[in-house]
């Protein structure tokens, strides 16, 4: 599986950009990366504060082709990201449910 990467200088939100690309291209997999996000989305309708220099990233994939219960996908994704980061950063990275990663008690 090859994931198509979309790189932007600035987006309203990586989530909204992913939705727009899915509708426009019909791709099954992709990754949105941006240098800045103006109006990010948190959980339960909360606003996500975005600071320049942070990582702004959304993955999208066709869940109809995945045989994992939808409620498990968020945790699996978070743990996969933790594993990836741990290859470059050797400090302890803590998973905090439902989808946060912490280093030294600070959300990353």
Locations of regions flagged by a protein language model:
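N-terminal lobe of the biotin/lipoate ligase/transferase fold
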Residues: 1-91, 107-108
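Catalytic palm active-site di-aspartate
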Residues: 92-105
């Amino acid at each position: 599986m090859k994931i198509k990467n979309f790189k932007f200088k600035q987006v309203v939100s990586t989530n909204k950009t992913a939705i727009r690309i899915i509708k426009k291209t019909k791709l099954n997999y992709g990754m949105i990366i941006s240098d800045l996000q103006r109006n990010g989305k948190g959980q339960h309708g909360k606003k996500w504060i975005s600071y320049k220099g942070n990582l702004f990233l959304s993955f999208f994939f066709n869940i109809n082709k995945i045989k994992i219960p939808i409620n498990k996908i968020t945790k699996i994704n978070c743990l996969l990201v933790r594993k990836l980061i741990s290859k470059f950063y050797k400090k302890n990275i803590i998973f905090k449910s439902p989808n946060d990663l912490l280093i030294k008690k600070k959300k990353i």
